[in-house]
Amino acid sequence: LRELAWDFVGIEEPVSPNAFDDMRKISECTGSPIILDESCLRVDQVAALARDAERWIINVRVSKMGGLFRSLAVVQAAGQAGIPVIVGAQVGETSVLTRAALIVARAAGTNLVAQEGAFGTHLLQTDVANPVLMFGEGGILKANAYGFATASGWGLTLRPTQDFAVSLSE
């Protein structure tokens, strides 16, 4: 990795989850932080990473963390420990999880390194919500264009369930 011609933002969990000693060695050898995915799932795991915070980036996915409040707690703890975060996404997340991820990313503030997701109907045949939250040109989701600041609730309307009936013969 050191011989490649560019620097990495981070290397996502290059060994088995929770093999922190090995991940530290890789970070030391490459000079790149390790992006923790399966190795950081709960807020109580963040404090142990604080002693060498520069070695880590925590990948926060709302679905992986167990919901919005747990994700926000991890983001807050990471910020207090000086550990940057990426707000990640599962492949095929709907606009509902994209909207939740926007809340988490906003809470991360300057501690946010990157954000994934907002694939919408680029990947999904149909979405469960309107408007469909989806990135456009350059991979940018223009969140301000959706009027969330003045909308009620999350600014999404769930579509009727009959739109999602699937035939077993398909």
Question: For each of these PLM feature ranges, what is it?
Answer:
Residues 91-170:
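Flexible C-terminal active-site loop/helix
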Residues 1-100, 125-126:
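Catalytic core of soluble alpha/beta enzymes
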